[in-house]
């Protein structure tokens, strides 16, 4: 039988693992240091100016090649052509302003039947055999 006065022994393995550094903690320290270095590298790349890249491929690998490729190919953002926007000539602007006085519905309603009427008139003239012959 067990005596109530005898103290229970604590497992020695649990005490040893708490007091002594194990190989797990040293491995975790190494991975955290690597992650810290990687984070610093990413931040340094973030603040670098974008370099010109002449890669014209749009595959997934090339889209993530560098930050410029990601912006241009992956997201479709291109900052190169700000001043090359086509402008309408002044004559076209004057013509469009007179057309804008009419409502859109009247313009579309009037323009389509006029074309159909012209076609039907031409068709009837061609099919008429003429008078008295």
From Swiss-Prot:
It is found in: Host nucleus, Host nucleolus. Residues 53-69 are annotated as: Cysteine-rich. Residues 70-80 are annotated as: Core. Residues 14-34 have a biased composition (Polar residues). The phosphorylation by CDK9 does not seem to be important for transactivation function. InterPro entries: IV_Tat, Tat_dom_sf. The modification Phosphoserine is found at residue 97. Keywords: Activator, AIDS, Host nucleus, Host-virus interaction, Phosphoprotein, RNA-binding, Transcription, Transcription regulation. GO terms for cellular component: host cell nucleolus. It holds the Pfam family Tat. It comes from the Viruses. Residues 95-105 have a biased composition (Low complexity). Residues 1-12 have a biased composition (Basic and acidic residues). Residues 83-94 have a biased composition (Basic residues). GO terms for molecular function: RNA binding; RNA-binding transcription regulator activity. Residues 1-34, 83-133 are annotated as: Disordered. Coiled coil: none annotated. The modification Phosphothreonine is found at residue 88. Transcriptional activator that increases RNA Pol II processivity, thereby increasing the level of full-length viral transcripts. Recognizes a hairpin structure at the 5'-LTR of the nascent viral mRNAs referred to as the transactivation responsive RNA element (TAR) and recruits the cyclin T1-CDK9 complex (P-TEFb complex) that will in turn hyperphosphorylate the RNA polymerase II to allow efficient elongation. The CDK9 component of P-TEFb and other Tat-activated kinases hyperphosphorylate the C-terminus of RNA Pol II that becomes stabilized and much more processive. The Arg-rich RNA-binding region binds the TAR RNA. This region also mediates the nuclear localization. Belongs to the lentiviruses Tat family. This is Protein Tat. It comes from Human immunodeficiency virus type 2 subtype A (isolate CAM2). The gene is tat.
């Amino acid at each position: 039988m067990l005596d109530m006065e005898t103290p229970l022994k604590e497992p020695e393995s649990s005490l040893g693992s708490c007091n002594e550094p194990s190989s797990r903690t040293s491995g975790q320290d190494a991975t955290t240091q690597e992650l810290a270095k990687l984070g610093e590298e990413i931040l340094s790349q973030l603040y670098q100016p974008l370099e010109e890249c002449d890669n014209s491929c749009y595959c997934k690998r090339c889209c993530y090649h560098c930050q410029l490729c990601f912006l241009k190919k992956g997201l479709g953002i291109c900052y190169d052509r700000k001043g090359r926007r086509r402008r309408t000539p002044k004559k076209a602007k004057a013509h469009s302003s007179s057309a804008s006085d009419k409502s859109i519905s009247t313009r579309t309603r009037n323009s389509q039947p006029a074309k159909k009427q012209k076609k039907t008139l031409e068709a009837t003239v061609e099919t008429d055999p003429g008078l008295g012959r």
